[in-house]
Amino acid sequence: MSEASSKNLSETLFQNHKQAKETSSLTQYMPSSLELLDTRREQSSQAWYRNLRRLQWIWQGVDPVEQEEILARIASSKHSRTHDEWLDTVMGYRSGNWTYEWTRVGMLHQKQAAERQGEEAADQMFAAALYYSIAGYPHLRNDNLALQAQVLANNAYQEAAKLTGFVVKRLEFSYQNKKIAGYLHLRNTDSPKPVVLVSAGLDSLQTDMWRLFRDYLAKRDIAMLTIDMPSLGASSHWPLTEDSSCLHQAVLNQLADLPWVDHFRIGLIGFRFGGNAMARLAFLESDKVKACVSLGAPIHDIFTSPNKLAAMPKMYLDVLASRLGKNVVDVRSLSGQLMAWSLKVQGFMSGRRTKTPILALGLEGDPVSPYSDNQLVALFSQGGQAKKVKSKTISQGYEQSLDLAINWLEDELCK
């Protein structure tokens, strides 16, 4: 896509959204829940509605200096905010608005891609796709600005796929009379590759995973197939239920039809909620899956602790409500409903162990994925392991976790 056509597309997408509803105001709550959230916001020292994933975004390919410049522009904006306490709630598509600022820098990377050749151009275009995706974060279903940013992210990713020397194929898989869209990434097509099915979670898009392939899997000649979680991105037309692995299971059962991958050597990687889905799939399809890695996955504890769920930041509650298709949210009722999502409550961790070895990784002190959850996964997995990444090394936490995970996965897939 040329710089001019990119600019025209963005202007077309966003021109009617100067007064678009701001992300933090989209989810409607029952009066009692709203009172709880308002009180908590006023008493909190948290300055942002969104959970700022600075380290994760840097790992995924965001320039750390650019990131701080973007956040500084948002923080210093003089425009009206939905909530004065939260810096990232500037209303309308204008300077200081979250989507506006991330999209603007995404366009700069797209411009740089047009000025470069080969892999350098591809890297800039993949970066543009990542910035556009973060512009839509946390991807609430009725967030018009986020949906427009998602269009830009998908277009940029497809353009980047044409520029790179790696092979990136957009594939479709049949499920319930619809199509599941995913991207297959390969170092080359010389021979069928071991393949890793990847899920990025409930507030990240599959297009955020490029660096996982380029810097980790491609070097080991392992293919990567990405699929969005139900209710998100390319999978937005399926509701999210406690059957969290349904789409990935449907794709897994069609991998034998792909000539580029070795369907006898299939691995799984799931981040956050995607780890819940991947661990679940490792139990359901143990004959087909050789190894599974879950990173920071909620497995049991948070789903069976209503008070912990109710105390989560509003962004997380908004995301859960959005994925479940809730129009009006009662926090207590939502907490009760999510008990069914515990893999232990579903019966996976109370009987026979899965033959698939699972490596369950978590950050020390993580309330969403406590060490007890990872121990539970390892206990009911033959050859399973639970690992804790020390919080004092959080700046290297993503690199350390992934080095550990990918080396382990490679060993298991190539046995």
From Swiss-Prot:
Family annotation (SUPFAM superfamilies): alpha/beta-Hydrolases
Known catalytic reactions: a carboxylic ester + H2O = an alcohol + a carboxylate + H(+)
Pfam (any one): FrsA-like
Keyword field contains Protein transport: no
InterPro entries: AB_hydrolase_fold, FrsA, FrsA-like, FrsA_esterase
Keyword rRNA processing: no
EC annotation from Swiss-Prot or TrEMBL: 3.1.1.1
Domain of life where this protein originates: Bacteria
Family indicated by similarity: Belongs to the FrsA family.
NCBIfam families: PRK05077.1 (NF003460)
Function of the protein: Catalyzes the hydrolysis of esters.
Name of the protein described by the UniProt record: Esterase FrsA
